[in-house]
């Protein structure tokens, strides 16, 4: 250990200790003594470095360097100089673990940003700027994972990165490539600049294996593709990994991307599934430790750093969705939050923090030896002595004794957390079990046995298992009281399996006898509701607290408005989450009211339609504001500037939505119209034409409504009823809509217009649409031509959608599509409007079938007896269709049970539309 030539190091004692601690420090001193002496003169290596200091140092060293090899040499020498400084500080107790790991992480950030900037210019010169489909220059989003993300890097850590970009597109140069390929090349160069080993060493080892699909997948991924991956393929261990994710470079698009990952990591409900994932990861690590014989690894071995992190992270994943303070990336910060929240005892927090800091100091001492990424205690006496000098222990045995004490405390707490004591229900419940087995068939009995022996149950924490055992007899008792116990049991078991990790729901069901009974009754009537609750357990919150009154329109509007007020306009994922939960929870309320309170059909349809309309109106408002924020307001057709009150945009509901007849699984038939000056530009800094503005509002609306996520989507949307169908523009101006309907539309499109109704958007534009609708529908038409066209369309639907001849022979009747079904009545109502409203304009006023029939009777076009008979038939068939939807059954029913109703409908069909249909039922 030669130090004679180090005349500028005033504190030779500190220098000697540094060199005793680290062979690597000796090597750096031999190679870069002049640099180190200059650095020492500044502050004697005593002061901490701020993030600004570090970024400025990197910038100053690399300033004006154009040559790649020179850039790589300079940054590697800077890294060696700083490593010497940090080893000096650590060996001489001039820093602490938190400060040291923060500075190391800041240096990594600075190097990544510098490498990213240096790598970009040659690519742009060759391929041009990467431009997204929205016309914006695309940036490479660099996400730091693991210790880098948490700003907890150790002395010789690798850095875990993920590369992303906002959206697809192409570069604008002569040698154009797509944005993804550009970002891949960009990322590859960034890695090379930092990771490649030269004569001067490396800067950071770069690990990209945490990206979606890991090794072998594309190096850079779009925001949308990442979101889709997490929703469809994200695994539990990836939730642990993404806790520490941090945007190192990428601006607002990076922030948006990170915000998108939050619901994947932190579930809204208390989520005990995190235990299972932790056990699996721990088992995998234990197998690896045994295979590689690395029990002395202070990170992966029993009681090591990883177990402390697991303890903290499992609580973060379980409770982080409801306790935002637990979402912090840093282990020690989150550990203290766990203590403050009462999730860990204060003494446990103190012991874990003490052990963690000790283990991290040992880790630094090991890595300082030779700048190697290892956490294994050395075997060589010389290296052991260096560690003893750093940590200030007299003998190796003394050190090991202290280390084992810390590891034992961590290990005991970890074991306490993941103990797996699972048994069958207590023998005191044997009598109930016997009663249950007496009424269950063999399949159901096997299901009970498999449930209590399942791996999923064995992975539950003991507290959750105990709650499940407490819940079980209450569940059996409720099943035994059911009129259909076998059916109720089979339908509810998937729900029990779904929520058994979220034991708060089990407790709530136990505490509310009425809720348990309602759940069992509902299960016998509606497997659809059971499946919704099973797939989206968060809806249980609503079910357990609902009063089974149908929701009122004003209450729906107030509720959704209040929820959305708390969300910023650019927090798209949160907006979609609120919209999805609003729709699903309120539809569930309606279904429960339908099943348990036997609410009238018309009121049920009104409520379902209200939920859809409120959702559409709120979504349109969000979409409009988002486009305005980016591009400014458009001008309307008269040249006036639009506003949030005068939007110039409206949504038209067709089909069941327009007819106020929505069912439980109905999609929404929508048409978008606008009143913009299509050529005039918006008044924002990124202006677009009025036509482009209208298109983007509609596209944003559809994205918010139809994007598939873990919570499903808000609604399925069908826009094919717009002018010219799928070949037509997504959004139509009111004037173009008018011209199309008056000059180009087929009669079936006017049929569809009968059930059209403006449901959201600017009031003035909506009124103009309603006036136009009435104008079109009340045109004078040849009654025979209308009859022929209606008949042709109806026959086409029967041929494609109705029951086959073979099915009819077996007594099958399709409630909706066969003769005498719902569509026959709808077509008759539409025929009345198209054929008779020229002379009777009031027929065109309403869009729902019942009121059209009432108006036809009022106008004398239909006898009151016939109108009443049709309404009764229609309501009976629709009520049955609702019941079948809730029961997850098809619309094919026993024809014999519907013969009288069908005869009523078919006789009127024969009289109004098709005299040749007299044998419709007889032929079956």
From Swiss-Prot:
One Gene Ontology BP term is: regulation of glutamine family amino acid metabolic process
Q: Where is this region: Adenylyl removase?
A: 1-422
Domain of life, per UniProt, equals Bacteria
Swiss-Prot/TrEMBL keywords: ATP-binding, Magnesium, Multifunctional enzyme, Nucleotide-binding, Nucleotidyltransferase, Transferase
Looking up SUPFAM superfamilies in the UniProt record yields:
Nucleotidyltransferase (SSF81301), Nucleotidyltransferase substrate binding subunit/domain (SSF81593)
What InterPro entries does the record point to?
GlnE, GlnE_rpt_dom, NT_sf, PII_UdlTrfase/GS_AdlTrfase
Q: Which Gene3D superfamilies match?
A: Beta Polymerase, domain 2, Nucleotidyltransferases domain 2
Q: Could you give one GO CC term from the UniProt record? A: cytosol
User: May I ask which residue range the UniProt record assigns to the signal sequence?
Assistant: none
* CDD domains linked: NT_GlnE_GlnD_like
Q: State the EC number(s).
A: 2.7.7.89, 2.7.7.42
Segments for region (Adenylyl transferase): 424-924
* Catalysis: reaction(s): [glutamine synthetase]-O(4)-(5'-adenylyl)-L-tyrosine + phosphate = [glutamine synthetase]-L-tyrosine + ADP; [glutamine synthetase]-L-tyrosine + ATP = [glutamine synthetase]-O(4)-(5'-adenylyl)-L-tyrosine + diphosphate
Q: Which HAMAP family match?
A: GlnE
What biological function has been recorded for the protein in this entry?
Answer: Involved in the regulation of glutamine synthetase GlnA, a key enzyme in the process to assimilate ammonia. When cellular nitrogen levels are high, the C-terminal adenylyl transferase (AT) inactivates GlnA by covalent transfer of an adenylyl group from ATP to specific tyrosine residue of GlnA, thus reducing its activity. Conversely, when nitrogen levels are low, the N-terminal adenylyl removase (AR) activates GlnA by removing the adenylyl group by phosphorolysis, increasing its activity.
Q: Which family does it belong to?
A: Belongs to the GlnE family.
- What's the name of the protein? Bifunctional glutamine synthetase adenylyltransferase/adenylyl-removing enzyme
Can you name the source organism?
Acinetobacter baylyi (strain ATCC 33305 / BD413 / ADP1)
Gene giving rise to this polypeptide: glnE
